[in-house]
């Protein structure tokens, strides 16, 4: 057989090389062949508009979308949730991108594990879903500071969501990194991304007319070539419009549907209509009720939107969980922090189970497309485990010695400006302030969000938004004054996001005299924080407990680890960690009564459970296979 070489067979070799290149390009495109008919695969026109219709290549395309946030769902369950979205008859996935989680410190990016955005998008494509990406930089999404990193607030003059130089400089560096990851996943490059949203609901903020054109240009300059969209509620719709960007609307009630045909038509003429967020339920706040939206009402409204010829995205299709401390808050008349569960009364439950909404909408979407949707995946197994009684204990005051050395400062320093985490401040968790006092009197100060006040180791009350003063009783000699301040969640929506600094804000006063000389401990409750506690540091639970305190126990799991929900009857307020995973906050004010524990985070055999309790502990932690999210309240 002859020995082939470039020298001896240049024509043949060149032909083979061209064939290989062509094969690579075809195979690259065929990775997405489940998304559209094969005869469209050679096209590169992408999503565009033609009169009242979306056109994908040469075909009219109605977007039937659903929102799932990869950062609120364990990675091991991404496939299950996306298959359920596809099986509901939907053709498009939408997701936000949280800047604060992807860049926890300036220039330090994290797209690994549960934050692997590229893997999530590629998985959606393999399952047969288009993707609409919503990269912000602000995303709202009931997440801390609307997804903006807290280190931005180190600048005392910071003006978020404007063309203020300190903000735009940070946005550009973040977009440089983010867009390098997502640009290759656009449709015209062979990927599933058919559209990208410019910021989020800016019409309701509208502090800088140059800002939205700036964000549009920032996206385009970094290679975004697919259709651009804006997203606003009906009140902010007109103010959120950007030249060359398709406006879409967010709504819930059938009474708001008129805006589809009136406001949208008036601001952009005959263009495709899309409800970018049809709110399938609502989020919950601590101290409130569990909000629900009747499935029949959901079906009626979605049917009306479809009948109108509009495209739609279900927000949320699957809400998931605010694991850790990522929940946001609202602050209009009162400050209200969001609960750990982001169940949202969505189409799938927090744990990914089917609902009446799913059954009804699957039938509707199957009728719309004329093609029976694929069969739904089986339910994820649930399990009730034996109750767990903590065996070991470590009071916060004894734990301090194992923490990093405190910051010393003449005056209090807010959380974001603490010289920790390589100069990026502290984003989440608690801060402990400590100073010495020599007299009694009235203690006052600005505490954000909730501060438990101690004399030595004895709790004497709380300071928060409503309680700004507390009486210090008469003491002999000097006393150590301690305030444990919790960041309960930065506001994610509204005009006051610039003022979301946490901890002690400004001076702390005793009898109107500023206190000095503080020790400040950062209690961010990360995995690294908890790893400081060796087994030798723990002790058997004593008869007389001192709070706050950490409790250590073991959850025994059989051969097949499965999802469960932890119920903390008798416990008051704190955080639960299982095998290093922060499940989130619990609080007996409700409405949420159980914490979701994914089975994929459990090991066969013994599982390590740590509870940080602020006030009073129960005797055990129970497991149940049914979530308890509180008393239902129908959304008006």
From Swiss-Prot:
- The primary site where this protein sits is secreted
Domain of life (superkingdom): Eukaryota
- Is the Signal keyword given for this protein? yes
Cleavable signal peptide:
1-32
Q: Which Gene3D superfamilies match?
A: Galactose-binding domain-like, Glycosidases
- Entry's family note: Belongs to the glycosyl hydrolase 35 family.
Q: What is its EC number?
A: 3.2.1.-
* Keywords, comma-separated and alphabetical: Glycosidase, Hydrolase, Secreted, Signal
The GO cellular component terms are: extracellular region
Cell location: Secreted
Q: Which residues form the active site?
A: 201, 277
Q: What is this protein called?
A: Beta-galactosidase-1-like protein 2
Q: Which InterPro entries does the protein's record reference?
A: B-gal_1-like, BetaGal1-like_ABD1, BetaGal_gal-bd, Galactose-bd-like_sf, Gly_Hdrlase_35_cat, Glyco_hydro_35_CS, Glycoside_Hdrlase_35, Glycoside_hydrolase_SF
Q: Does the keyword Thylakoid apply?
A: no
């Amino acid at each position: 057989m002859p020995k082939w070489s470039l020298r001896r067979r240049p024509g043949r070799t060149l032909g083979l090389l061209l064939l290989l290149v062509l094969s690579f390009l075809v195979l690259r495109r065929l990775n997405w062949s489940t998304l559209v008919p094969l005869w469209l695969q050679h096209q590169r026109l992408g999503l565009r508009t033609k009169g009242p219709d979306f056109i994908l290549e040469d075909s009219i395309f109605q977007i039937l979308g659903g929102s799932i946030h990869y950062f609120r769902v364990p990675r091991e369950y991404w496939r299950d949730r996306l298959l359920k979205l596809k099986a509901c008859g939907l053709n498009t996935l939408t997701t936000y991108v949280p800047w604060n989680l992807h860049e926890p410190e300036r220039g330090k990016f994290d797209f690994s594990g549960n934050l692997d955005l590229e893997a999530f998008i590629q998985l959606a494509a393999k399952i047969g879903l288009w993707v609409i990406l919503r990269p912000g930089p602000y995303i709202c999404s009931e997440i801390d500071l609307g997804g903006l990193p807290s280190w931005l607030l180190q600048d005392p003059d910071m003006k978020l969501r404007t063309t203020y130089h300190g903000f735009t400089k940070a946005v550009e560096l973040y977009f440089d990194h983010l867009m390098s990851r997502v640009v290759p996943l656009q449709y015209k490059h062979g990927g599933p991304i058919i559209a990208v949203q410019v910021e989020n609901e800016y019409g309701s903020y509208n502090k800088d007319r140059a800002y939205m054109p700036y964000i549009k240009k920032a996206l385009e300059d970094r290679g975004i070539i697919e259709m651009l969209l804006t997203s606003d509620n009906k009140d902010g719709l007109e103010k959120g419009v950007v030249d060359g960007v398709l406006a879409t609307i967010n709504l819930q009630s059938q009474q708001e549907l008129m805006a589809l045909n009136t406001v949208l038509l008036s601001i952009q003429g005959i263009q495709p209509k899309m409800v970018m967020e049809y709110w399938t339920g609502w989020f919950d706040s601590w101290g409130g009720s569990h909000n629900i939206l009747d499935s029949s009402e959901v079906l009626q409204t979605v049917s009306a939107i479809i009948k109108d010829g509009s495209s739609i995205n279900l927000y949320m299709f699957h809400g998931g969980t605010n694991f850790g401390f990522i929940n946001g808050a609202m602050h209009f008349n009162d400050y209200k922090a969001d609960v750990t569960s982001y169940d949202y009364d969505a189409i799938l439950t927090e744990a990914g189970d089917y609902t009446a909404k799913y059954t009804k909408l699957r039938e509707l979407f199957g009728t719309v497309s004329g093609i029976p949707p694929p069969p739904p995946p089986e339910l994820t197994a649930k399990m009730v485990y034996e109750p767990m009684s903590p065996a070991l204990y470590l009071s916060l005051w004894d734990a301090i010695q194992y923490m990093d050395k405190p910051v010393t400062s003449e005056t209090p320093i807010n959380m974001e400006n603490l010289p920790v985490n390589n100069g990026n401040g502290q984003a989440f968790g608690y801060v402990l302030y400590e100073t010495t006092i020599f007299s009694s009197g009235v203690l006052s100060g600005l505490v954000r969000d909730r501060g438990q006040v101690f004399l030595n180791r004895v709790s004497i009350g709380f300071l928060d938004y409503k309680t700004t003063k507390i009486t210090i009783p008469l003491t002999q000699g000097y006393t150590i004054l301690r305030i444990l301040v919790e960041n309960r969640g930065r506001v994610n929506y509204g005009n006051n996001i610039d003022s979301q600094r946490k901890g002690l804000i400004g001076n702390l006063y005793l009898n109107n005299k500023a206190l000095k000389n503080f020790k400040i401990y950062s209690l961010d409750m990360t995995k690294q924080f908890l790893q400081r506690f060796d087994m030798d540091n723990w002790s058997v639970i004593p008869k007389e407990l001192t709070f706050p305190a950490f409790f250590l126990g073991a959850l025994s799991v059989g051969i097949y680890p499965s999802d469960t929900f932890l119920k903390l009857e008798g416990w008051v307020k704190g955080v639960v960690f299982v095998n290093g995973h922060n499940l989130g906050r619990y609080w007996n004010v409700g409405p949420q009564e159980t914490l979701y524990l994914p089975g994929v985070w459990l090991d066969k055999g013994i599982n390590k459970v740590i509870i940080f309790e602020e006030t009073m502990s129960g005797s055990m932690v129970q497991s149940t296979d049914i979530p308890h999210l509180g008393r239902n309240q129908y959304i008006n």
